[in-house]
Amino acid sequence: DDSIKIRYKRNLGLRPYQKIILQLSIALIVAFVVYKNELIRGDLYIPFTKNTVSLGWGVIPLVVFIFIATTNSVNLTDGLDGLAASTTLVYMAGIAAIIAIVAADADKNGLSLYVKEYQGLLTVCFATVGSLAGFLLFNCFPAKIFMGDVGSLALGGVVACVSILGRLSLYIPILGVMFATSAVSDIIQVVHYKRTKRRVFLMAPFHHHLQKKGLSETRIGFLYSTITGIVALICVLTLI
């Protein structure tokens, strides 16, 4: 995407359909790996419990949808200085806490293979949190560095993959409520405008609506991170 912008000196980069094709290709690979993995198969944790539900081969279309939806939702959230980075940082810290609880439960039940799997995911979580903390020093308002699509789409992929491989896919719309808000508000705005020629929000995604209402970029970032943090705390407390 960046190389196209530099080589052809245009801001377009990859076209939307090209990005979707690439995302779909990666999503299918992830779905196949998940389905073939003996430790995952079609099992998913039911939110707020330590119980799992098995979807069998049905996990394949679910993983494909979740991967593409999550990747683009995080990308849509990257509209203000530090917003996507701070929200993702809190999300990854929250999902790490949930993974740690699940890993401890697996260790208690003598499931050592699951424990090793979760330890690997925790390493990715901590690495992502540390990277984002350093990045935010330069990306918070006023930003000196911008992640662009190469950053936000990658972050979305990490959020999706860690959650999926941890059998925590169903937590994404809950813990990632602010990512979902960005996507849903954008869809509502487009669909409603095409039908009525009127806007539901002053501007979409929702963080731009808040900006139009007079909230500063710093306050919006704090709001998104706080809400994500509160939801993460609720998720963790229900599992303890």
Where are these regions (language model features)?
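Alpha-helical transmembrane segments
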Residues: S3, L28-N37, G42-L44, T49-N51, ...
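Membrane-interfacial loop-to-helix junctions in multi-pass inner-membrane proteins
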Residues: I6-L22
